[in-house]
C-alpha cells in the first residue's frame, strides 16, 4: 500500500512485489483443483515471449469470472498502491506448478476488491477455470511510473542503508506497512551473547524525517539514524 507518511515523507508503494508473503489464493480455489500445468488451450501462446529477467509476481488467478473466458484475480496490491501494474500491463506470464506460459491480456479492470481480466484465447468458463491457481507475473519495466518521491518496495529491497556519517547500518531485507507509513526492516551482521554470529535487525520508518536520500543508482538509502538506536 502507498505510504501515508507525515511531513516531507518519502513514499514506498507496497506490498513489495517480488518479496512478500503471497495471499493464500490456492485455498480460495475449488477443492480438487490440481497444481499442474496451465491448459495450453486456455491461453494463446507466443513462443517468442520467453520468461523476462525482470518478472515480478503481482497476483494470482483465483477463479473464473462469468462465461466468456474472463478470470478473477487476487492482486498483491490495490490500484493506486502498486496494483496498477496488474491492471495496466498487457503482457502476463503465468506459472502453475512447473509450467510457465505467456498470455496477452485484452482487458483488465477492477471488480469490487478484486481484478478481473480476459486473457486472449480464453474463450469460455472452462478455459478460464483451467487457469485457476496460476501465479501472475509482469515485467518490472511495465510498472506505471511513479512520482519522484515514490518508490516500489521491490526497488528498495537489497539496498544498503547508511547514516549521514557514512556508517553502514545494513541492507533492507523487507518493507513493512504499519497502516500509517512504511518501515524498512534492515538486517546487519551481529554477534550473539554466546559469541556466535547472528543477524541483527533494525526497524527504520520510511519517512522524510529519517530518510534523507534514496540513491538507487548508488544502491543505498541515506538515513538520519545512529547504529546504537
UniProtKB/Swiss-Prot annotation:
Claim: Chaperone is one of the keywords in the record: yes
A GO biological-process term: ribosomal small subunit biogenesis
Gene3D superfamilies found in the cross-reference section: PRC-barrel domain, RimM
Domain of life, per lineage: Bacteria
Subcellular location: Cytoplasm
Pfam family, one: RimM
Protein's job: An accessory protein needed during the final step in the assembly of 30S ribosomal subunit, possibly for assembly of the head region. Essential for efficient processing of 16S rRNA. May be needed both before and after RbfA during the maturation of 16S rRNA. It has affinity for free ribosomal 30S subunits but not for 70S ribosomes.
HAMAP family: Ribosome_mat_RimM
Similarity remark: Belongs to the RimM family.
Record-given protein name: Ribosome maturation factor RimM
Originating organism: Burkholderia pseudomallei (strain K96243)
Upper taxonomic lineage: Bacteria, Pseudomonadati, Pseudomonadota, Betaproteobacteria, Burkholderiales
Amino acid at each position: 500500500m502507498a505510504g501515508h507518511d507525515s511531513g516531507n515523507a518519502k513514499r514506498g508503494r507496497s506490498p513489495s512485489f517480488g518479496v512478500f508473503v503471497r495471499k493464500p489464493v490456492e485455498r480460495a480455489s475449488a477443492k480438487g483443483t490440481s497444481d499442474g500445468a496451465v491448459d495450453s488451450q486456455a491461453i494463446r501462446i507466443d513462443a517468442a515471449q520467453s520468461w523476462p529477467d525482470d518478472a515480478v509476481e503481482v497476483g494470482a488467478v483465483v477463479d473464473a469470472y462469468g462465461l466468456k473466458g474472463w478470470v478473477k484475480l487476487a492482486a498483491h496490491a490495490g490500484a493506486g498502491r502498486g496494483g496498477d501494474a496488474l491492471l495496466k500491463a498487457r503482457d502476463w506470464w503465468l506459472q502453475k506448478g512447473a509450467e510457465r506460459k505467456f498470455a496477452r491480456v485484452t482487458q483488465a479492470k477492477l471488480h469490487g476488491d478484486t481484478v478481473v481480466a480476459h486473457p486472449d484465447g480464453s474463450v469460455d468458463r472452462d478455459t478460464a477455470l483451467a487457469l485457476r491457481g496460476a501465479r501472475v507475473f509482469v515485467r518490472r519495466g511495465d510498472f506505471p511510473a511513479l512520482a519522484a518521491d515514490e518508490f516500489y518496495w521491490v526497488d528498495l529491497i537489497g539496498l544498503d542503508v547508511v547514516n549521514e556519517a557514512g556508517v553502514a547500518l545494513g541492507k533492507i531485507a523487507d518493507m513493512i506497512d504499519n497502516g500509517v507509513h512504511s518501515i524498512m526492516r534492515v538486517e546487519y551482521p551481529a554477534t550473539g551473547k554466546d559469541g556466535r554470529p547472528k543477524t541483527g535487525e533494525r526497524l527504520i520508518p520510511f519517512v522524510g524525517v529519517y530518510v534523507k536520500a534514496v540513491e538507487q543508482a548508488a544502491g543505498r538509502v541515506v538515513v538520519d539514524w545512529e547504529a546504537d538506536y
